[in-house]
């Protein structure tokens, strides 16, 4: 058989002769699922063309024994078409009033609600909403105040929220794992005093380092002030020569030394401020702790 000789179906057209077989005719309307009033099976006769492999016998001549010419045949295949007629079953459901099919070929029905069900509600029946927890009303638009129900939801305080509620506890109690019952707060850490003691020692070490840095800068400042005094004497020795008679390198050197003196003075003031901030009074670290 050739590779192209497989079967394929080509629909040319079909006519419908519907034979209704309504289920539940004896015992009332058939209900397969919610909202389905009847179910019908339709016998639909179909007529279409179908391709198939048709054998073809072709004669040919061949050489037989005794050098005789014989006539025989071989089989080949070709694609041919034939008309097929058969009946197929189709199922059709009829929805009850207030229900509809999700799509035309569906075998189930869903309820129709004229207004949508809000806040996670679902349409469970004709114009009937099934609301999610925490909501009520015809269209699930009313928030339920759980805190005013007869049920004890929280061991202490209860606060209503949209669609739910939250519990609260008075100090020093805290909410437990279930979010409703209150339990004792976490015990005060026994290492708090030790942590503060370490902080005090670190602050003392930083203060000593700052004091050393201030002393070093003060020494440098004193040396620069001595040089400034000498420079002033030198300037006075140069004067009463007019300032415009000073050489440019002399003016530049004077300005540079003055800038360094001003910069060091600013650093000393900044360190003194930091040193003052590090100084702690006896009760600044809490009761019972001293620097």
Swiss-Prot record:
* Keyword Ribonucleoprotein recorded: no
Which InterPro entries does this one have? Dev_Signal_Modulators (IPR050969), EGF-like_Ca-bd_dom (IPR001881), EGF-like_dom (IPR000742), EGF-type_Asp/Asn_hydroxyl_site (IPR000152), EGF_Ca-bd_CS (IPR018097), EMI_domain (IPR011489), Growth_fac_rcpt_cys_sf (IPR009030), NOTCH1_EGF-like (IPR049883)
One Gene Ontology cellular component term attached to this UniProt record is: extracellular region
Q: Which SUPFAM superfamilies match?
A: EGF/Laminin, Growth factor receptor domain
Q: Name one GO molecular function term.
A: signaling receptor binding
Q: Which GO terms describe its biological process?
A: vasculogenesis
Disulfide bridges in this chain = 37-96, 64-70, 95-109, 113-123, 117-129, 131-140, 147-158, 154-167, 169-182
Q: Which residues form a coiled coil?
A: 198-231
Question: Which segments constitute the EGF-like domain?
Answer: 110-141, 143-183
Any Pfam family: EGF_CA
Write the protein's name.
Epidermal growth factor-like protein 8
Q: What taxonomic classification does the UniProt entry list for its organism?
A: Eukaryota, Metazoa, Chordata, Craniata, Vertebrata
């Amino acid at each position: 058989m050739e590779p192209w000789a497989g079967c394929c179906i080509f629909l040319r057209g079909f006519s419908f002769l519907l034979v209704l077989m309504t289920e539940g005719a004896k015992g009332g309307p058939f209900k397969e699922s919610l909202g389905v009033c009847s179910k019908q099976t339709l016998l639909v006769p179909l007529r279409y063309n179908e391709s198939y492999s048709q054998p073809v016998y072709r004669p040919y001549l061949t050489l037989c024994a005794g050098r005789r010419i014989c006539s025989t045949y071989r089989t080949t295949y070709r694609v041919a078409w034939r008309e097929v007629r058969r009946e197929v079953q189709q199922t059709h459901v009829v929805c009850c009033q207030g229900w509809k099919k999700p799509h035309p070929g569906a075998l189930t029905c869903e309820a129709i609600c004229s207004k949508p069900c809000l806040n996670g509600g679902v349409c469970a029946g004709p114009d009937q909403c099934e609301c999610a927890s925490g909501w009520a009303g015809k269209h699930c638009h009313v928030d339920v105040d759980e805190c005013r129900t007869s049920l004890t939801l929280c061991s202490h305080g209860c606060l209503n929220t949209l669609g739910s509620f939250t519990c609260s506890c008075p100090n020093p109690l805290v909410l437990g794992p279930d979010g409703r019952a209150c339990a004792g707060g976490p015990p005060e850490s026994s290492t708090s005093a030790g942590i503060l003691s370490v902080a005090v020692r670190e602050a003392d070490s930083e203060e000593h380092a700052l004091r050393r840095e201030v002393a070093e800068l003060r020494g440098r400042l004193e040396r620069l002030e001595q040089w400034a005094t000498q420079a002033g004497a030198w300037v006075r020795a140069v004067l009463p020569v007019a300032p415009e008679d000073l050489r440019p390198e002399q003016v530049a050197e004077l300005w540079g030394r003055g800038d360094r003196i001003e910069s060091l003075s600013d650093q000393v003031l900044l360190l003194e401020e930091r040193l003052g901030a590090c100084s702690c009074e006896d009760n600044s670290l809490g009761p019972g702790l001293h620097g």
